[in-house]
């Protein structure tokens, strides 16, 4: 059974790696988004569409089609096009290098938008049509406030992953089932992995272990609580915006959850037992014929808490579903996409828990050791939560302390009678020494006159408002600009700061542009104005602006990227 469990787990990881490899394969031709870089700006009462066309590629004039929703589209005048003998369509009018297209719109009503369809080719290869939907700024009706319309407000672009997912949902509802597969891939990310010890402790870590069918029911119930909460929170964020997400990540909420998980871990150590009131307990026992640890209601509630913990993590699939809800207002399809995404995130948890329930022994002293081990693992959740609000330099000490406590318990609790077990003990002592590195390094730094050189953090100009951003974009005319939207409670934002922005090659690449950062932690009025202007649905979000101060919407980043991934992204600018 153990062999089958590891075979299944290896297969899941292999599928994820194969998927990643497939997406990383570089095609012979540029992607459509790379060949035809689209951007738009709304200013001076007019909408400007712009395509930067790669060398050797071209756009068909006849395939550029515009349609307005809740607005009236004026006559569109194209610049002079080049006549070209196309091997597919005969003589056609095309555009090379770049195309700037002014568009006049009037009679803008509630939630106006413009849909743009275009198609291009290169020698020997033709692309399918691309579609972009742009939310329109009411200032296009004649409000000449330069400040209110000087910046683009669109995020829907052909090659932004979240936008492609949103468009796929709009064009084909069957693509919704792809979110289930995307969720499985997200299950192995830092936002979801902390859910495993909580579920495993509930199903495996109590006295009378359930049978396989009962373990499946409990784990499925847990995932349902997590998925439904994740879905409802996602729809709420799409409807209300970032303020709701900020509220969930406030210090009071995070500290409360951390205290709860610490108490649960203490109960796993046998310090006390968590029991419901007797009347509730009797009813739950009658329904489930299990002790309190296995009650379905309890497990569902813990799943809800897990959904709260996982909710702030922004990824391209999550952003795509939220973007679809925000643009279409279709709560049913958007909610189902969010549910399938969360369900996919929970499937590996179900499999690991059910197989672990079968593999681990169900009685004897080993059971108490397993329960204590899960208590240590559960203590990782408070650290995961508290690290969002503590300065980053405290986090290594928290993890080191937990690892030292766990290894110390493991060394003292195992029986070392054979030569093999003695070797294991030596390895554990070595691991104990390695995990003490943050504390040893702290002592060394306080007693040594020479500190080890560290990689400097990326220098960023701090801004606080949309008005200040406009001023900076004007000041940096002729230079590309990057804007990082950061919050203390955003885990992936801290990962960018720690792992990506400290990379020397990343810093060298960013040295050619102006790098700005705005702190969204407090969700001030200035934060809200900027967020609404750019239609930001979650963090982390990184925006890029060209030399003229227009956002390059096709390269907007949502979700964490490693240094290598970020460098590849920058090469597309």
From Swiss-Prot:
Record's keyword annotation contains Transit peptide: no
GO cellular component, one term: plasma membrane
Membrane-protein topology: Multi-pass membrane protein
Entry keywords, A to Z: Cell inner membrane, Cell membrane, Cytochrome c-type biogenesis, Disulfide bond, Electron transport, Membrane, NAD, Oxidoreductase, Redox-active center, Signal, Transmembrane, Transmembrane helix, Transport
PROSITE patterns for the chain: THIOREDOXIN_1, THIOREDOXIN_2
Entry's Gene Ontology molecular function annotations: electron transfer activity; protein-disulfide reductase [NAD(P)H] activity
Signal sequence, renumbered to the chain: 1-20
Cytoplasmic side: 197-227, 273-292, 353-365, 415-425
Any one Gene Ontology BP term: cytochrome complex assembly
Transmembrane annotation, as ranges: 176-196, 228-248, 252-272, 293-313, 332-352, 366-386, 394-414, 426-446
Parts of the chain on the Periplasmic side: 21-175, 249-251, 314-331, 387-393, 447-573
Ranges for domain Thioredoxin: 440-573
Compartmental location: Cell inner membrane
EC main group: oxidoreductase
S-S pairs: 121-126, 191-313, 490-493
EC numbers for this chain: 1.8.1.8
Xref: InterPro entries: Cyt_c_assmbl_TM_dom (IPR003834), DsbD_gamma (IPR035671), DsbDN (IPR028250), DsbDN_sf (IPR036929), Thiol_diS_interchange_DbsD (IPR022910), Thioredoxin-like_fold (IPR012336), Thioredoxin-like_sf (IPR036249), Thioredoxin_CS (IPR017937)
NCBIfam families associated with the record: PRK00293.1
PANTHER family to which the protein is assigned, alphabetical: THIOL:DISULFIDE INTERCHANGE PROTEIN DSBD
Role according to the record: Required to facilitate the formation of correct disulfide bonds in some periplasmic proteins and for the assembly of the periplasmic c-type cytochromes. Acts by transferring electrons from cytoplasmic thioredoxin to the periplasm. This transfer involves a cascade of disulfide bond formation and reduction steps.
Family note: Belongs to the thioredoxin family. DsbD subfamily.
HAMAP family membership: DbsD (MF_00399)
Protein name per the record: Thiol:disulfide interchange protein DsbD
Gene from which this protein is expressed: dsbD
């Amino acid at each position: 059974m153990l062999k089958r469990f590891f075979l299944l787990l290896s297969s899941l990881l292999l599928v994820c790696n194969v998927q990643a490899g497939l997406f990383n394969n570089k095609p012979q031709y540029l992607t459509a988004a790379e060949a035809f870089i689209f951007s738009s700006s709304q200013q001076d009462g007019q909408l400007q569409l712009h395509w930067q066309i790669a060398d050797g590629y071209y756009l068909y004039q006849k395939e550029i089609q515009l349609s307005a929703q809740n607005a009236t589209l004026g006559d569109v005048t194209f610049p002079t096009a080049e006549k070209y003998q196309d091997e597919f369509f005969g003589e056609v009018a095309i555009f090379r290098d770049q195309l700037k297209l002014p568009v006049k719109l009037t009679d803008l009503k509630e939630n106006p938008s413009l849909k743009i369809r275009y198609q291009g080719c290169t020698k020997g290869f033709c692309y399918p049509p691309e579609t972009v939907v742009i939310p329109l700024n009411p200032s296009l009706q004649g409000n000449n406030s330069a400040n209110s319309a000087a910046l683009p407000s669109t995020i829907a672009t052909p090659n932004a992953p979240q936008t492609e997912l949103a468009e796929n949902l709009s064009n084909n509802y069957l693509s919704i089932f792809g979110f289930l597969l995307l969720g499985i891939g997200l299950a192995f990310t830092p936002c979801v992995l902390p859910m495993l010890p909580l579920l495993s402790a509930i199903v495996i870590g109590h006295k009378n272990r359930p049978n396989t069918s009962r373990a499946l029911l409990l784990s499925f119930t847990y995932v349902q609580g997590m998925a439904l909460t994740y879905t409802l929170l996602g729809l709420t964020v799409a409807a209300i915006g970032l303020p709701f997400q900020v509220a969930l990540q406030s210090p009071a909420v995070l500290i409360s959850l951390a205290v709860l998980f610490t108490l649960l871990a203490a109960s796993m150590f046998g310090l006390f037992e968590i029991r419901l009131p007797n009347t509730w307990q009797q009813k739950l026992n009658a329904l489930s014929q299990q002790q309190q640890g296995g009650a379905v209601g309890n497990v569902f509630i813990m799943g809800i808490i897990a959904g709260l913990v996982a909710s702030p993590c922004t990824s391209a699939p999550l952003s795509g579903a939220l973007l679809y809800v925000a643009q279409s207002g279709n709560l049913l399809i958007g909610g189902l996409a969010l549910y399938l995404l969360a369900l996919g995130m929970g499937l590996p948890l179900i499999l690991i828990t059910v197989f672990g329930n079968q593999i681990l022994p169900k009685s004897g002293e080993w059971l108490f050791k397993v329960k204590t081990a899960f208590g240590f693992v559960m203590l990782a959740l408070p650290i995961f939560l508290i690290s969002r609000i503590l300065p980053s330099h405290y986090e290594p000490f928290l993890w080191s302390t937990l690892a030292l406590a766990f290894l110390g318990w493991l060394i003292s609790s195992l029986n070392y009678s054979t030569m093999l077990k003695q070797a294991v003990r030596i390895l554990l002592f070595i691991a104990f020494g390695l995990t003490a590195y943050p504390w040893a390094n702290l002592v060394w730094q306080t007693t040594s006159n020479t500190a080890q050189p560290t990689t400097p953090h990326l220098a960023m100009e701090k801004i606080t408002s949309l008005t200040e951003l406009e001023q900076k974009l004007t000041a940096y005319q002729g230079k590309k600009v990057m804007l990082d939207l950061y919050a203390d409670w955003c885990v992936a934002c801290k990962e960018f700061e720690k792992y990506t922005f400290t990379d020397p090659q990343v810093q060298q690449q960013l040295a050619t542009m102006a790098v700005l950062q705005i702190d969204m932690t407090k969700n001030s009025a200035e934060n809200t104005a900027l967020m609404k202007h750019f239609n930001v649905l979650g963090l982390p979000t990184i925006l890029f602006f060209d030399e003229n101060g227009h956002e390059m919407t096709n390269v907007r980043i949502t979700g964490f990227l490693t240094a290598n991934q970020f460098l590849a992204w920058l090469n597309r600018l």
